[in-house]
Amino acid sequence: MDEKQPLTPEQQKLVDEQVEALMRGVVEVVPKEAFREKIEKSVRTGKPLNIKLGMDPSAPDVHIGHTVVLQKLRQFQEYGHHIQLLIGDFTGKIGDPTGKSETRKVLTDEQVKQNAQTYVEQYGKILDIEKTEILYNSRWLSELKFDDVLKLAGQMTVARMLEREDFSKRYKTGQPISVHEFFYPLMQGYDSVAMETDIEVGGTDQTFNLLMGRQLQEAYGKEKQVMLTLPLIEGLDGVRKMSKSLNNYIGIDEAPNEIFGKAMSIPDELMVKYYKLATDVPMDEIEALEKGLADGSVHPRDAKMRLGHKFVEMYHGKEAADEAEQYFKTVFQKRALPEDIPVFSWEGDKEVPLIDLLVTLNMQSSKGEARRMIQGGGVKINEQKITDIHTVVSVEDNMIVQVGKRKFAKLSLT
């Protein structure tokens, strides 16, 4: 079909619908006019756009913060566009220096491979993986010869690299910057050249890297991609970006009760943002909810319960969501112990340090984590709070151990 042919009224309506839906939650589109032009071209020709999301496979656990861009990809996919999920197995050996204050450790090939597989499995909870192209950038980056690398490096100046806030801070404070770190945005940009990307999606912290794709596509004679950025969502502390290392996250692979319980601790002022960015709840419903919260006709607790139910339903199904909601009401609103506390057969010493007990029961992943939880008042034995890290527990039959608000264990000596 002629790409210059005017759109029919039906096609124009579809373009308007796509642009409006795909702009939901977006912070910036560069350039905005090209975004609409690409959608128009796709509708006119019937050819789907190539939509790219690059992943640095250094931390494989997907949390709600990651799903902001994944929900956007899902929208593109529902409109028939082609999703290119790029696993940076080659760039992952460097690690994305964005926001880092020091040089990152290099991952082994095996670590990158394992992390990438975990990513794909978890992303499949949001995307239709059968309709998603999975690419590894080692396919083309490992084929570059040294003269190709020199050509690539010649597209960027050191001064331009130092405009990046993270590099600038490290340079000014005397922190080392390895030359290979400068290649990360160059390689990410070259990925867009190799993949012939039409639109690249990423968080606002990826703006520099995404713009690099446009610059390199032009340098290599390709049509320039559109950059589309989405917000970084604050974690459960309400201040810092959601991150597993900061322990302010909701992991999509966590148990349903854990997801629901964590959702109930989302700060009131962030609820609407979570709804808009991390769910597919229609905007008119979100606007009505926002209005209700503002005029007091909707209680924040009820809005959080709906959000928690939605998160669990998205990643574990409706039945699990219903059960998690009931569990929360029983344990936290009625202050009762759950009926289905896991039972552990205890065959160890009858006198055991509390820290060792928590780790042995897999209620904490390390002694350091257990120590911090005890000091923070998050551990109870038979509903009695324990804050002394040196406590030695006398193990009894049917003794209840509680960590935080949602982890329980019952010990059996028989």
Curated annotation (Swiss-Prot):
<dbReference type="GO" id="GO:0003723">
    <property type="term" value="F:RNA binding"/>
</dbReference>
<protein>
    <recommendedName>
        <fullName>Tyrosine--tRNA ligase</fullName>
        <ecNumber>6.1.1.1</ecNumber>
    </recommendedName>
</protein>
<feature type="binding site">
    <location>
        <position position="244"/>
    </location>
    <ligand>
        <name>ATP</name>
    </ligand>
</feature>
<dbReference type="InterPro" id="IPR024088">
    <property type="entry name" value="Tyr-tRNA-ligase_bac-type"/>
</dbReference>
<dbReference type="InterPro" id="IPR054608">
    <property type="entry name" value="SYY-like_C"/>
</dbReference>
<keyword id="KW-0067">ATP-binding</keyword>
<dbReference type="InterPro" id="IPR001412">
    <property type="entry name" value="aa-tRNA-synth_I_CS"/>
</dbReference>
<dbReference type="GO" id="GO:0004831">
    <property type="term" value="F:tyrosine-tRNA ligase activity"/>
</dbReference>
<dbReference type="InterPro" id="IPR002305">
    <property type="entry name" value="aa-tRNA-synth_Ic"/>
</dbReference>
<keyword id="KW-0694">RNA-binding</keyword>
<dbReference type="InterPro" id="IPR036986">
    <property type="entry name" value="S4_RNA-bd_sf"/>
</dbReference>
<dbReference type="GO" id="GO:0005829">
    <property type="term" value="C:cytosol"/>
</dbReference>
<comment type="similarity">
    <text>Belongs to the class-I aminoacyl-tRNA synthetase family. TyrS type 2 subfamily.</text>
</comment>
<feature type="domain" description="S4 RNA-binding">
    <location>
        <begin position="352"/>
        <end position="413"/>
    </location>
</feature>
<dbReference type="GO" id="GO:0006437">
    <property type="term" value="P:tyrosyl-tRNA aminoacylation"/>
</dbReference>
<dbReference type="InterPro" id="IPR024108">
    <property type="entry name" value="Tyr-tRNA-ligase_bac_2"/>
</dbReference>
<dbReference type="InterPro" id="IPR002942">
    <property type="entry name" value="S4_RNA-bd"/>
</dbReference>
<feature type="short sequence motif" description="'KMSKS' region">
    <location>
        <begin position="241"/>
        <end position="245"/>
    </location>
</feature>
<comment type="function">
    <text>Catalyzes the attachment of tyrosine to tRNA(Tyr) in a two-step reaction: tyrosine is first activated by ATP to form Tyr-AMP and then transferred to the acceptor end of tRNA(Tyr).</text>
</comment>
<dbReference type="Pfam" id="PF00579">
    <property type="entry name" value="tRNA-synt_1b"/>
</dbReference>
<keyword id="KW-0963">Cytoplasm</keyword>
<dbReference type="InterPro" id="IPR014729">
    <property type="entry name" value="Rossmann-like_a/b/a_fold"/>
</dbReference>
<keyword id="KW-0547">Nucleotide-binding</keyword>
<keyword id="KW-0030">Aminoacyl-tRNA synthetase</keyword>
<dbReference type="GO" id="GO:0005524">
    <property type="term" value="F:ATP binding"/>
</dbReference>
<dbReference type="InterPro" id="IPR002307">
    <property type="entry name" value="Tyr-tRNA-ligase"/>
</dbReference>
<keyword id="KW-0436">Ligase</keyword>
<dbReference type="Pfam" id="PF22421">
    <property type="entry name" value="SYY_C-terminal"/>
</dbReference>
<keyword id="KW-0648">Protein biosynthesis</keyword>
<feature type="short sequence motif" description="'HIGH' region">
    <location>
        <begin position="57"/>
        <end position="66"/>
    </location>
</feature>
<comment type="subunit">
    <text>Homodimer.</text>
</comment>
